[in-house]
């Protein structure tokens, strides 16, 4: 079998195509969740915490060089200048993104599982002793 033929068989199998569709939809869906967190949830949390902006929460680990021209209270400016800073606010935002995304995926899987019809279990195999007893019975009937 040629490599191209093997690749075609591999690429068109149901699982590979399902995975490709899932990755594409997941990428688009993560942008929606990111926007929900950044544009809807974090501003509400900011209002509830007195205007706290999580994106600029950081701990300075190094010194700011004298040639630094940006805002020393801006995590992005410090990062761009190569100043060592621990950006825990950005991590909090990403963690909230993850929790929301995981919860939505959980709900989707739960919903899909409800829609699926439960597969009927195959009848249990007849025990060997019962089969043997039936054979003996049938043999006795024939005499």
From Swiss-Prot:
The keyword Lipoprotein does not apply. Keywords: Cell inner membrane, Cell membrane, Ion channel, Ion transport, Membrane, Transmembrane, Transmembrane helix, Transport. InterPro entries: Mechanosensitive_channel_CS, MS_channel, MSC/AndL, MscL_channel. It is a multi-pass membrane protein. One of its GO terms (molecular function) is mechanosensitive monoatomic ion channel activity. It comes from the Bacteria. The chain crosses the membrane at residues 10-30, 89-109. It is found in: Cell inner membrane. Pfam families: MscL. One of its GO terms (cellular component) is plasma membrane. Its main location: membrane. Channel that opens in response to stretch forces in the membrane lipid bilayer. May participate in the regulation of osmotic pressure changes within the cell. Homopentamer. Belongs to the MscL family. HAMAP family: MscL (MF_00115). This is Large-conductance mechanosensitive channel.
């Amino acid at each position: 079998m040629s490599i191209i033929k093997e690749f075609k068989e591999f690429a068109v199998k149901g699982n590979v195509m399902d995975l490709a569709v899932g990755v594409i939809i997941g990428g688009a869906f993560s942008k929606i969740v990111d926007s929900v967190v950044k544009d809807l949830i974090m501003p509400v949390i900011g209002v509830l915490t007195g205007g706290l902006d999580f994106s600029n929460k950081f701990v300075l680990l190094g010194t700011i060089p004298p040639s630094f021209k940006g805002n020393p209270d801006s995590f992005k400016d410090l990062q761009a200048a190569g100043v060592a800073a621990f950006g825990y606010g950005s991590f909090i935002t990403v963690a909230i993104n993850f929790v929301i995304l995981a919860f939505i995926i959980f709900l989707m899987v739960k919903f899909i599982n409800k829609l699926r019809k439960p597969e009927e279990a195959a009848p249990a195999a007849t025990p060997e002793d019962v089969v043997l007893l039936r054979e003996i019975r049938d043999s006795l009937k024939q005499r």
